[in-house]
Amino acid sequence: MRTQLIFGFVLFSTSLFSMPADSINHRKWITHGALIGVSGGSLLTLQNVWYSEYNHEKFHLFNDGSNWMQMDKAGHGFTAYHITKEVSSMQRWAYNYSKPGLGVIYAMGYLTTLELMDGFSAGWGFSLFDFAANGAGAGLFLLQEKVFNKQVILPKFSYSTSNYASIRPDVLGNNFPQKLLKDYNAQ
């Protein structure tokens, strides 16, 4: 009896693992690896580049609702929208279907992590307005997928160098990548 069970298990296992090579979804592993690598790498980079200049302190909120003429909020919405869009696109490529809600969950999880990092930074703080803008951007993608089954409103970004960064490089950036992120006068 024991030999028959072992033989049956081996025969069954062999049939399971002898499926054609194309039955393994390599795209799934590539997608998950890319998301983990990009997410982890970008969070570590931001921790070392953006937050290293400030002390860590207890979690606190920061009301920036009236700052920067809402350009910061537009940037949060833009980022959330495009993260949701790209994750949904990657999911479609890996699985041949897309559940845009998963893109929203990923985008909100990633951007909330950034807001939490802000919340523990002496130079910043967790902004409920930023959090709401993130939700609005991700929600814009989801709403269009549910209502139109396609994207009708596509948030876009443009940048032209301003003269203000040279006046206040500590606030508006010293080099192109910093200026791109910080100089709202040029966006």
Predicted regions and their residues:
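Hydrophobic alpha-helical membrane segments
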Residues: 19-187
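Bacterial Sec-dependent N-terminal signal peptides
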Residues: 1-23
